[in-house]
Regions:
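Small-residue-enriched core segments of transmembrane alpha-helices in multipass membrane transport
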Residues: 61-66, 213-222
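Short active-site segment of divalent metal-dependent hydrolases/proteases
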Residues: 77-78, 117
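Post-HEXXH active-site segment of zinc metalloproteases
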Residues: 82-96, 130
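Non-catalytic, topology-defining segments of multipass membrane proteins
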Residues: 1-63, 72, 97-212
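Hydrophobic transmembrane alpha-helices of multi-pass small-molecule transporters
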Residues: 39, 93, 222-223
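Juxtamembrane membrane-interface segments at transmembrane alpha-helix termini
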Residues: 67-76, 222-224
């Protein structure tokens, strides 16, 4: 049994679709301005209350806002957040780091995903949430804070680590052009460098704060 891309496709009014697809730099700045305003606000409050009883609820709020970054990633990947291509790409790379999604790998795999959604026959759609064979325990762990760490080898960070060492996963071999693979490796190494820098800051300042502000939010906030 397999899934392919043959299914019902509704008719769309092209004029209405064009109106809905209109892009605006102002709307993009407004969205990201509000987003980062609240992210910085709750991050600053977490810093001020670090070690007190108020830390946990503020950190949960901060992490939940941070974990919205995949939505920002998705819109900037499609270049719909802004009218300007450069602005989309800048915020795409920022959102990619926040979401632990190496930008070049995901640009190509997401393009394939939209062309062959849920395809399991032949070339595989690697963005399927429930892969075959299905692991329901792993699926439900996604809805528990830090549940992803029960399966560390299935996290996005582990994939980036493999790419940083030059080991290309099946999704890259299948979706990315040959000339892009070295860029994926380079970007992955940059991500790992930034992670090491954050951990080093925590060690230097003898504080867990940098780790909880930049590395933990996806594990804590995404399930919430």
């Amino acid at each position: 049994m397999h899934a392919d891309d043959t299914w019902f496709k509704p008719e769309l009014n092209k004029k209405i679709l064009k109106e809905l697809s209109r892009r605006s730099d102002w709307e993009g700045f407004k969205h990201f301005g509000i987003y980062f305003l609240f992210l910085f606000l709750f991050g600053f409050l977490t810093y001020l209350t670090w070690g007190s009883l108020l830390t946990l609820p503020l950190l949960v709020c901060y992490s939940t806002i941070w974990a919205y970054s995949p939505s920002n990633w998705h819109e900037t990947l499609h270049r719909t957040a802004f009218k300007n291509k450069l602005l989309n790409d800048i915020f795409y790379y920022v959102s990619s780091f926040m979401a632990n999604m190496e930008p070049v790998r995901w640009r190509w795999s997401h393009t394939f995903h939209h062309s062959h959604t849920l395809q399991t026959h032949g070339d595989y759609d690697h963005e399927i949430q429930l892969k075959r064979p299905t692991d329901l325990i792993h699926f439900f762990c996604q809805f528990i804070p830090f549940g992803q760490l029960i399966y560390p080898h299935k996290t996005l960070q582990f994939e980036i680590l493999k790419h940083s060492m030059g080991y290309l996963t099946d999704v890259v071999k299948q979706n990315a052009p040959e000339k892009e693979k070295s860029i994926i490796i380079r970007n992955s190494r940059l991500f790992v460098f930034l992670w090491i820098l954050i951990i080093s800051l925590s060690i230097y300042y003898s504080s867990w704060l940098p780790i909880f502000l930049f590395l933990v939010p996806n594990y804590l906030g995404a399930p919430l």
